């Protein structure tokens, strides 16, 4: 049932085990061998590439049979590689791809691949896009970059990273543009004596909101050399005020004629906009890929954020027409005669923004054509004081009433009086912040009701009476 071991005779039991204890000096010899102090040494082959395993660990399993070079001072060799940027050339081995792209290798002398001298750093000749990623025309596009706009591999990525849609890289200018004309040196008789600085008026810049010339510019002697100048010269008179500068006109300040508002502006520095402010017309050609699914965002809006790198089809004949509609102050299109956006009416905003095809009214205005004061009323937040002044200037034949809703904390009512008065009543609703009421909450209507002479404003428990 159970296997029995054969009996052992006395001769077999008396035999000693066939092994010898380890020598006490074995550990010391191993340490000396690792340090290269023993009799065994690795072959030095100056013409052959360095042994990668030996350079990394200091030992080599092949010993004298290894066909690579084993320099005695490994630290000096690695320091030389780091300083000179020379990496091992291993003919017959595959080339190091990272070295071919970047010109560097993080493994250094211990890399087991081939590093040709004249082939490293080819990445430096590859053009980069505006985000710093390589542009490789003809290669496959980086899918991660097309989705997120970023690439974790950076400059070492081997795929194509196209420029963003609508982005053009202008060529570098041949020379820096001259924003201000050069000023020539003045002779002592032209400025009437030494001064610590020279005053030169700046030219007008196109599109500025100032009608007069800009303030004078102070030029130090380092910019305009003046013979006989000394830092310890007579004090300079204080700068003229803006009103005094307009009064001076074209008179001479320190021998230099001040430029007036009639001076022609500098061409080419600030180009004027032919289109209205806030309206940007962008012409972009999107790729047509027959056989691919159609870009739904392009079909709805006529635009595509991926541009030429989009992988979907962009049919030109199905582009929605872009109507040149006017945008409201909050950036939503005003389309009179079109159905109102129900989402905007209920929530006060629209998730489609300027691409929405419905109307987003800011308020309705009904007025008598004879009342010219309301003809040019802007669709924007309107100050209460200015609104009262405009209403007061209107003729008495067309009384105007402002009807507002939505506020519950304050209101204003009028008390009717005789017909002989020519005052105008206004029902104003103040918001919590006070000061202005957006036209989206006001409705103007023309009526022939009795004029009002008094008003009462109730706000946060305080009552104020005014008489017009």
Curated annotation (Swiss-Prot):
Mind listing the GO molecular function terms for this protein? DNA binding; mRNA binding; zinc ion binding
Q: Where in the cell is it found?
A: Nucleus
Q: Where is this region: Disordered?
A: 1-25
Keyword list (alphabetical) reads: DNA-binding, Metal-binding, Nucleus, Repeat, Zinc, Zinc-finger
Q: What is its main location?
A: nucleus
Q: Which GO terms describe its cellular component?
A: nucleus
Q: Which Gene3D superfamilies match?
A: 2.30.30.1190, Zinc finger, CCCH-type
Q: Which residues form a coiled coil?
A: none
What is the protein name given in its UniProt record? Zinc finger CCCH domain-containing protein 32
Q: What is the lineage of its organism?
A: Eukaryota, Viridiplantae, Streptophyta, Embryophyta, Tracheophyta
């Amino acid at each position: 049932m159970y296997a029995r071991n054969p009996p052992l005779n006395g001769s077999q039991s008396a035999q000693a085990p066939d092994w010898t204890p380890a020598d006490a000096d074995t550990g010391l010899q191993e340490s000396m061998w690792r340090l290269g102090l023993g009799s065994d040494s690795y072959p030095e082959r100056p013409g052959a590439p360095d042994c990668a395993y030996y350079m990394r660990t200091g030992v080599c399993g092949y010993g004298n049979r290894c066909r690579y070079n084993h320099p005695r001072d490994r630290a000096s060799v690695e320091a030389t590689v780091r300083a000179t940027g020379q990496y091992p050339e291993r003919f017959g081995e595959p080339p190091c791809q990272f070295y071919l792209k970047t010109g560097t290798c993080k493994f250094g002398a211990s890399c087991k691949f081939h590093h040709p001298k004249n082939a490293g750093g080819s990445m430096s000749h590859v053009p980069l896009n505006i985000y710093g990623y390589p542009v490789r025309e003809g290669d496959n596009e980086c899918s991660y970059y097309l989705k997120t706009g970023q690439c974790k591999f950076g400059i070492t990525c081997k795929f194509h990273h196209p420029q963003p849609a609508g982005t053009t890289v202008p060529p570098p200018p041949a020379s820096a543009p001259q924003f201000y004309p050069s000023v020539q040196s003045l002779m002592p008789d032209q400025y009437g004596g030494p001064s610590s600085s020279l005053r030169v008026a700046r030219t007008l810049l196109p599109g500025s909101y100032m009608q007069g010339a800009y303030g004078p510019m102070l030029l130090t002697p380092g910019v305009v050399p003046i013979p006989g100048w000394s830092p310890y010269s007579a004090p300079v008179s204080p700068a003229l005020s803006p009103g005094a500068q307009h009064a001076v006109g074209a008179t001479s300040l320190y021998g230099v004629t001040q430029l007036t508002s009639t001076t022609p502006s500098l061409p080419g520095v600030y180009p004027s906009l032919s289109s209205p402010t806030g309206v940007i017309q962008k012409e972009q050609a999107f790729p047509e890929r027959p056989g691919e699914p159609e870009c739904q965002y392009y079909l709805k809006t006529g635009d595509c954020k991926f541009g030429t790198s989009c992988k979907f089809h962009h049919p030109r004949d199905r582009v929605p027409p872009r109507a040149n509609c006017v945008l409201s102050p909050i950036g939503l299109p005003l389309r009179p005669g079109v159905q109102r956006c129900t989402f905007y009416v209920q929530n006060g905003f629209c998730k489609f923004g300027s691409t929405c095809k419905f109307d987003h009214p800011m308020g309705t205005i009904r007025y008598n054509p004879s009342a010219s004061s309301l003809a040019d009323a802007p669709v924007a937040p309107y100050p209460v004081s200015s609104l009262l002044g405009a209403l007061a200037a209107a003729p008495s034949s067309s009384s105007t009433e402002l009807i507002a809703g939505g506020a519950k904390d304050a209101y204003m009512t009028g008390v009717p009086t005789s017909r002989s008065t020519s005052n105008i009543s206004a029902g104003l609703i103040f918001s919590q912040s006070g000061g202005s009421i957006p036209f989206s909450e006001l409705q103007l209507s023309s009526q022939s009701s009795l004029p009002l002479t008094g008003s009462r404003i109730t706000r946060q428990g305080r009552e104020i009476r005014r008489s017009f």
